[in-house]
């Protein structure tokens, strides 16, 4: 019996020594963590928040490692002592020993949870606790652990002394103890979960606050670190350098502190122990979300589309043409009809192109001015002299501008269909030579004058391409367009759609054909009846006549720096009488005008596309021309071969009933035209 008492004394001594060792190591861990905290506090405000999290985690890892190591040592000592004391006891005694170990592990878990709570508070308070407070807390927990170990050791020794007859009662007590321990673990797990949620919310708030500071300062660089191991700790490094936001090239970069922790076996054991007890050190998920957002924002780069053409392509519609936002519902899409969207198809195939939106019934002069402001941007100024001469308002609608930097040296390609070909010729003339009448009027009356009328704006157009354009006018306008009944019908339609509730815009608002907000429709009709438009030559119907076209030809000239090209179609066949008759596949509304032109007195004018004679579409009579070849030329009209069985709208695909003209054929035509425009830039580029 004395020998057993001596062994019991040695056991008490070893347990006490272990407790002292645990307390000493805890003090050392706390001192190390405090030293790290004091060193980190020297940084900026942003760094202090992030570094305190790292210090808290490092402290937790060291304490867990120390506790795990000492508990293992204690367990080994107890195991040796118990083996010497019990020797070959019954299996029930072995179960008793195992129960003691489980109880010790529970105490260890309680200690870890308590330490975790301290670290949570440590993180939330941004490392502002004093070293003395930490030491008091550590001493308190060390004392509790020491008392627990003594009590367990004493209980174990007394149980060993107990006679075998008392083992049954001990087993029953052990079962009760197990139930209590399980209940404690559930309670601790619940508390730990609540603690983690609170810690995660605080850390998320800290992260958001840090991001707001970073946005205000605009000088911080975030370096985001992430690890795939769920037990690892993510960290943010906020540097006060005046550099843009950067993300490390490595997917999962690690700091020196992480590397040292990785190599520390004790830290790994502590983290593993925390995992087994459902205890986490940081809210990793919230930081991963921030990391992903930062990486997405950093890696975003503005995509600058590269076009095949250096100079944008501007598509200019003809008489009675509209863009989709202002056209009557009975009309199809102008550029492509139901077959395709020409502008969109060009864009998808690498060509920058735009659809101009100008007056449907206006004169070439007014349309050219509108086209200038459509490209350049601004409020349309028809000119003081021009407005006074024809009796309409000086100013029109305001355009945003599709090419605001348009100026000499910054060129464009102008492609006009039908009357649009005349309009783009008028615009180029105004750019180069301006309007002498406007210049003189401004000298006499003062006021402002648009730069367009001052002239001297050469090298702004790379090429001029016309499709079925009546360069020399058309018999259709001579015979029908200027008849009183036809003119009245056309303008009545414009007047009807000019009411304030209509979205349709014929481009005659400067003539007063737009109902005012406080004006009744009856008042609007009476006012419009007195408009000078009905007898004016400043209209599209006049400019399409042979006289109107001849007047334009006299006022315009070829620019030696521009590539000119014309495309012509015909959709009539010769009869036995020598006249031209509309083909069966001609667009139905054009059969009347096509047959009318086919009966013209001048035989050379009879072949036509339904609206325009072939001879008028090829080139202006008073200007130089050549047959087009594979090699482009400047300063001369290049006439392409006439396209047979192509009527006036086949160039823009508006006839959906024409089975001969397919979508693929239309697409091929426009792709070839666009490629030709790109080739012409080699001749007209000012950067050679």
Swiss-Prot record:
One of its GO terms (molecular function) is metal ion binding. Residues 45-54, 144-172, 184-211, 274-289 have a biased composition (Polar residues). Residues 1-35 form the signal peptide. Its EC number is 3.1.1.3. It is an enzyme of class 3 (hydrolase). Residues 68-79 have a biased composition (Low complexity). Ca(2+) binds at residues 647, 650, 655, 658. Residues 31-309 are annotated as: Disordered. Belongs to the AB hydrolase superfamily. Lipase family. This is Lipase. It comes from Staphylococcus epidermidis. The gene is lip.
């Amino acid at each position: 019996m004395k020998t057993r008492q001596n062994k019991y004394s040695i056991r008490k001594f070893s347990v006490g020594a272990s407790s002292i060792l645990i307390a000493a190591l805890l003090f050392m861990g706390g001192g190390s963590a405090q030293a790290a905290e004091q060193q980190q506090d020297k940084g900026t405000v942003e760094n202090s928040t992030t570094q305190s999290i790292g210090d808290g985690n490092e402290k937790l890892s060291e304490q867990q490692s120390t506790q795990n190591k000492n508990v293992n040592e204690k367990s080994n000592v107890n195991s040796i002592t118990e083996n010497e004391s019990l020797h070959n006891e019954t299996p029930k005694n072995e179960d008793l020993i195992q129960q003691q170990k489980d109880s010790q592990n529970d105490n260890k878990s309680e200690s870890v949870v308590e330490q975790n709570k301290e670290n949570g508070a440590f993180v939330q308070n941004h490392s502002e606790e004093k070293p003395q407070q930490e030491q008091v807390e550590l001493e308190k927990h060390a004392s509790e652990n020491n008392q627990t170990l003594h009590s367990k050791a004493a209980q174990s020794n007394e149980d060993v002394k107990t006679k075998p007859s008392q083992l049954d009662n001990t087993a029953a007590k052990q079962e009760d103890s197990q139930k209590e321990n399980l209940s404690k673990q559930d309670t601790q797990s619940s508390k730990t979960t609540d603690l983690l949620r609170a810690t995660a919310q605080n850390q998320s708030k800290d992260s958001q606050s840090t991001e707001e500071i970073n946005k205000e300062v605009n000088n911080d660089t975030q370096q985001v670190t992430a690890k795939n191991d769920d037990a690892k700790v993510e960290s943010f490094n906020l540097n006060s350098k005046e550099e843009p936001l950067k993300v490390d090239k490595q997917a999962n970069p690690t700091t020196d502190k992480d590397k040292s922790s990785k190599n520390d076996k004790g830290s790994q054991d502590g983290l593993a122990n925390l995992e087994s007890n459902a205890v986490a050190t940081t809210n990793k998920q919230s930081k991963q979300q921030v990391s992903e957002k930062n990486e997405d924002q950093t890696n975003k780069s503005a995509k600058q589309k590269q076009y095949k053409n250096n100079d944008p392509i501007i598509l200019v519609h003809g008489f009675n043409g509209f863009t989709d936002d202002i056209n009557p519902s009975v009309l199809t899409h102008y550029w492509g009809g139901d077959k395709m969207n020409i502008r969109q198809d060009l864009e998808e195939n690498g060509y920058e192109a735009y659809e101009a939106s100008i007056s449907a019934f206006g004169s070439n002069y007014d349309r050219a001015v509108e086209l200038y402001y459509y490209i350049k941007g601004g409020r349309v100024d028809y000119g003081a002299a021009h407005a006074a001469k024809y009796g309409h308002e000086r100013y029109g609608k305001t355009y945003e501008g599709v090419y605001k930097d348009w100026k000499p040296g910054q060129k464009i390609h102008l492609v006009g269909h039908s009357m649009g070909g005349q309009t783009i010729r008028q615009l180029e003339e105004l750019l180069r030579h301006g309007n002498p009448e406007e210049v003189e009027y401004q000298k006499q009356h003062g006021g402002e004058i648009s730069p367009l009328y001052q002239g001297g704006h050469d090298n702004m157009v790379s090429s001029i391409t016309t499709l079925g354009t009546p360069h020399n006018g058309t018999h259709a306008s001579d015979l029908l367009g200027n008849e009183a009944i036809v003119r009245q019908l056309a303008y009545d339609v414009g007047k009807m759609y000019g009411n304030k509730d209509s979205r349709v815009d014929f481009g005659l608002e400067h003539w007063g054909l737009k109902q005012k907000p406080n004006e009744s429709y009856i008042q609007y009709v009476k006012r419009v009846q007195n408009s000078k438009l009905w007898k004016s030559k400043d209209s599209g119907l006049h400019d399409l006549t042979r006289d109107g076209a001849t007047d334009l030809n006299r006022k315009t000239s070829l620019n030696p720096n521009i590539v000119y090209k014309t495309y012509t179609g015909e959709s009539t066949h010769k009869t036995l009488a020598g006249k031209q008759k509309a083909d069966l596949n001609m667009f139905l509304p054009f059969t009347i005008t096509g047959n009318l032109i086919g009966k013209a007195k001048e035989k050379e004018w009879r072949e036509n596309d339904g609206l325009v004679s072939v001879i008028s579409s090829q080139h202006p009579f008073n200007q130089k021309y050549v047959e087009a070849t594979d090699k482009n030329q400047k300063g001369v009209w290049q006439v392409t071969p006439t396209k047979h069985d192509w009527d006036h709208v086949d160039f823009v695909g508006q006839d959906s009933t024409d089975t001969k003209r397919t979508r693929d054929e239309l697409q091929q035509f426009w792709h070839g035209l666009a490629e030709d425009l790109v080739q012409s830039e080699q001749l007209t580029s000012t950067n050679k």
